[in-house]
Amino acid sequence: MTKNKKEFTEAPVNFGANLGLMLDLYDDYLQDPSSVPEDLQVLFSTIKTGEAHIEAKPTTDGGGSQAGDSTIKRVMRLIDNIRQYGHLKADIYPVNPPERQNVPKLEIEDFDLDKETLEKISSGIVSEHFKDIYDNAYDAIVRMERRYKGPIAFEYTHINNNKERVWLKRRIETPYKASLNDNQKKELFKKLAHVEGFEKYLHKNFVGAKRFSIEGVDTLVPMLQHTITLAGNEGIKNIQIGMAHRGRLNVLTHVLEKPYEMMISEFMHTDPMKFLPEDGSLELTSGWTSDVKYHLGGVKTTNSYGIEQRISLANNPSHLEIVAPVVAGKTRAAQDNTHQVGAPSTDFHKAMPIIIHGDAAYPGQGINFETMNLGSLKGYSTGGSLHIITNNRIGFTTEPIDGRSTTYSSDVAKGYDVPILHVNADDVEATIEAIEIAMEFRKEFHKDVVIDLVGYRRYGHNEMDEPSITNPVPYQNIRKHDSVEILYGKKLVDEGIISEDEMNEVIDGVQKEMRTAHDKIDKNDKMNNPDMEKPESLQLPLQSDTKDFSFDHLKEINDAMLDYPKDFHVLKKLNKVLEKRREPFEKEEGLVDWAQAEQLAFATILQDGTSIRLTGQDSERGTFSHRHAVLHDEENGNTFTPLHHVPQQQATFDIHNSPLSEAAVVGFEYGYNVENKGNFNIWEAQYGDFSNMSQMMFDNFLSSSRAKWGERSGLTLFLPHAFEGQGPEHSSARLERFLQLAAENNSTVVNLSSASNYFHLLRAQAASLDTLEMRPLIVMSPKSLLRNKTVAKPIDEFTSGGFKPIITEDIDEQKVKKVILASGKMYIDLKEYLAKNPNDSILLIAVERLYPFPEEEIKEVLKSLPHLENVSWVQEEPKNQGAWLFVYPYLKALVANKYDLTYHGRIQRAAPAEGDGEIHKLVQTKIIESSINN
């Protein structure tokens, strides 16, 4: 049988499932060498004459060989098994190695082979990288076993991309020349001594204090240091690190170089800022309520690694793994050039992310899968994240058998087609090589790499915890196990690189350094009365932008947005819709609807020099087919983005349809905005109802980051919200939750009823970016109101004015007996009802900004109504949801027993809305009529 030559050359070199094809091709070669590709002719020619005809010994074990197989076929099967499964017998466990069941055949004997037979075969059949190094297949296989079963275990045969597999195979099997000379090994030992000495000192001097020790995976710190050095060699100047609490204090101290004095001060509850380096190289921020020490991050600017680099450790809550997309977003922001026209350009060599995981949390938390899914997407890729799993093989008290369904905690990463390296945390030099392989792979392919750093946990989950209660046997062995500091020190002593006295001198010297730092701190300098007031910059609500625009200016923008290339063919049906956007400038009755108001706002913001990034599911078109920010040629599918062609544009416009993810995408956009505070970042939910998939991002980052960490964000959320008969899962963005989180002017929450007010709001938010006044903006965006003529406004409302927290009507104040307050679609429903059923005794007020609540503005209106008897709040949400419970205390204070205060809306409900559209209409009508007539 003759195979197509192309069929093999495009097939995997690491045979795997294609091993049968390889063996068939070898049989073809024996019959006719010209029947196989030239590269295989070269490989097969290295086999010594006659050796392929040595018959296999009969076997009945069903394992490695089959009766009658040639020796070469059995050798190939052995080699293939070593590559695929050698990791299962690798020396990657410092202590308490697991018992492996049903491990595939990996030994020479399993394939009815022996040394004598293998010595007759060329080493080239084992690996093309061995043919000029080893005399025969036996020596080459011994080398392969050492490589694949050593302190680094490799998993890469699952990768679909042939080039990546070939590259990894070559890198793994090419004899490795150690990158560390004797002096570097000495320095590496000193680093380890500082890592462990730091932990020992704190353990001894602050007994029982939580620090979430790094001990057991100490080599993480030199791995990070080496990564930063290699990144510097590549010219990467921005390093973004994300990690949870374990080992964080050590990373802060030895990677970001936070002084020992500062760290010890935090344990003593004295003021650490007295010891902040005066050269400005270390940036540490904190909010007015602050956070525990093992959540805090920082930024270090350093030349320690060869070039000036900015190393950032992201602030992190206790919620494991949720910082991963934040770090990815921060990295992408550092890579993007937003100071140009059109879309931003991305340079993967400007920044890189390092995301550190826990072995229990990595497979357990879905945010990791969402984040890894972003890795190769145009709008989110960072050119490859370095993932390091600090694998201490336990989660609090839960052992792997109860914590995951896979062999390794890293197995979930295989679905994302990335290489996985397992490395023994006690083999210091192996951990350095693992980093070097990972960095070389990232540089070559711009993809994620996972390093599983396999170690242990010296103490319990925290230092007050006794692990032997639930894990007695493993901890008997851990307590007897020498630390990596001692193991590596002894190794260097044995190699003659240092003496035992030098080793002990280094270890003792770290304790002296720590004691010297400790002695500098005045234990009486307690922070008894910390300032917990929000900063002055947050005393006022978001201020309106009052810039005026001429009619001609806005018309020029609008015309440019409708000017497409001559060879671009807009879908005819869509073109008719878009052409109507000329009417506000050409017809007296023409109105600007929501989508056009947004486009005009974005265009003027770009002219002001503020870049915009908008992402979300279906955001390019808009869930409700209203935005059309990216147009598609109906003949060839090419795309055109009008906002890339704004006259006098000074910054980029970036828009992407996101994957079907909420938590990771919101985290990514949050991180992007934190890193690039001048960028107008917007995340749009497909429906507001789905935004609660990101609730942890809202709770732990968006609403509280500034109070905890001094971390400013101006992220904007568009959350479609309105009760329109679409059922309980397509009605509510859970407005009440955002209002519950609102405090200390930490955000702006709006539910708008006017396209022009939307225009001015967006401009106000953009103007606040990269100032001390910036804060998140939460918009309950419309659905049916997108095309509502009551919401649409004439162009003169856009040329001047500013954002209005409330909107009132022109009315005879002497006649008003009742004020109705409502927002969003509820206000429009009431307005349209009153237009058909006029009532001079009712004043309808649109509360556009719910937080900060416009008390003074409403108070002024109420004071002007001498015959007022009743104030009513009307909403479409159930009474226990929506804004009512939030606004009630404000309204109660405003009426001050002068007027009746009543509520009109749905009764308290467990589910937000009715499932039947007709019942919805009945309930909605009842709310409107009740509020008007009662």
Curated annotation (Swiss-Prot):
Function according to Swiss-Prot or TrEMBL: E1 component of the 2-oxoglutarate dehydrogenase (OGDH) complex which catalyzes the decarboxylation of 2-oxoglutarate, the first step in the conversion of 2-oxoglutarate to succinyl-CoA and CO(2).
Subunit annotation: Homodimer. Part of the 2-oxoglutarate dehydrogenase (OGDH) complex composed of E1 (2-oxoglutarate dehydrogenase), E2 (dihydrolipoamide succinyltransferase) and E3 (dihydrolipoamide dehydrogenase); the complex contains multiple copies of the three enzymatic components (E1, E2 and E3).
Keywords in alphabetical order: Glycolysis, Oxidoreductase, Thiamine pyrophosphate
EC assignment: 1.2.4.2
The protein's name in its UniProt record: 2-oxoglutarate dehydrogenase E1 component
Transmembrane feature ranges: none
Gene Ontology process terms (BP): glycolytic process; tricarboxylic acid cycle
Catalytic activity: N(6)-[(R)-lipoyl]-L-lysyl-[protein] + 2-oxoglutarate + H(+) = N(6)-[(R)-S(8)-succinyldihydrolipoyl]-L-lysyl-[protein] + CO2
Family from the record: Belongs to the alpha-ketoglutarate dehydrogenase family.
Entry GO CC: cytosol; oxoglutarate dehydrogenase complex
Single GO MF annotation: oxoglutarate dehydrogenase (succinyl-transferring) activity
Cross-referenced InterPro entries: 2oxoglutarate_DH_E1 (IPR011603), 2oxoglutarate_DH_E1_bac (IPR023784), DH_E1 (IPR001017), KGD_C_sf (IPR042179), ODO-1/KGD_C (IPR031717), THDP-binding (IPR029061), Transketolase-like_Pyr-bd (IPR005475)
Species in which this protein is naturally found: Staphylococcus epidermidis (strain ATCC 12228 / FDA PCI 1200)
Cofactor names: thiamine diphosphate
